[in-house]
Amino acid sequence: MRAVVQRVDGASVVVDGETVGAIDGEGLCVLVGVTHDDTKEKAAQLARKLWSVRILHDEKSCSDLDAPLLVISQFTLYGDARKGRRPTWNAAAPGDVAEPLVDEVVAQLRALGATVATGRFGAQMRVSLTNDGPFTVLVEV
């Protein structure tokens, strides 16, 4: 499981002209990709990492500040563009495998006490954010 984590000062996701998820103020925008061997245990591990990673201001975490997270599925995180001119998606898990695992990341975050907004799985989304720093890290579990 792979996540691109961005420290933000507000973020939102729009589907078909409707805002389906948004966070205000300091928090994290998290793009989550799932591969074939990912499990519910890895989803829980990723959730714990996202909740506790100290990348907000003054080396604080979302759990320290009760900061919100916007979690968005993104299968293209497992794209491979090393050969040719088009990426392949062979390493990305199919939707019926990936969707419940992204949902599990969200459920685990909420169980930890996090405020979580989400995108819509499989939809064409427009993501807007103010990257604070900029500060972006890749997390793999």
Swiss-Prot record:
Keywords: Cytoplasm, Hydrolase, RNA-binding, tRNA-binding. Transmembrane segments: none annotated. One of its GO terms (biological process) is tRNA metabolic process. This is D-aminoacyl-tRNA deacylase. It comes from Streptomyces coelicolor (strain ATCC BAA-471 / A3(2) / M145). A motif (Gly-cisPro motif, important for rejection of L-amino acids) lies at residues 133-134. Homodimer. GO terms for cellular component: cytoplasm. Its EC number is 3.1.1.96.
